[in-house]
């Protein structure tokens, strides 16, 4: 029986890590953490006005007091971070030595 190297599980680990990252992203982006306003029969989670006999509820939405929306910036943040890391790696490593065959100068004989 010949000796065989153990199986390489790097692709399985990468797929599992990617799945966990996507799951965490979806969980955190779809979670509603706004405070509960109103009673069980009259809930106003996104703001509004309700009047019923002696009960009056007027609640402004959390976003109405702060109209700034940072969603477009959050979409481009990962790309910006990747580009920043790449630029810092290129600028900080001035003594870059490439040992691959296509980077080495060909000797002309």
From Swiss-Prot:
UniProt keyword list: Host endoplasmic reticulum, Host membrane, Membrane, Transmembrane, Transmembrane helix
Membrane keyword on record: yes
Cytoplasmic topology ranges: 1-9, 93-109
Listed GO CC annotations: host cell endoplasmic reticulum membrane; membrane
Transmembrane segments: 10-30, 72-92
Stretches assigned to the Lumenal side: 31-71
InterPro entries linked: Plant_vir_prot (IPR001896)
Top-level taxon: Viruses
Keyword Secreted: no
Localisation: Host endoplasmic reticulum membrane
Family: Belongs to the Tymovirales TGBp2 protein family.
Function: Plays a role in viral cell-to-cell propagation, by facilitating genome transport to neighboring plant cells through plasmosdesmata,.
Note: TGBp1, TGBp2 and TGBp3 seem to act together for cell-to-cell propagation. TGBp1 is the main movement protein that physically cross the plasmodesma with the viral genome. TGBp2 and TGBp3 would facilitate TGBp1 function.
Protein name, per record: Movement protein TGB2
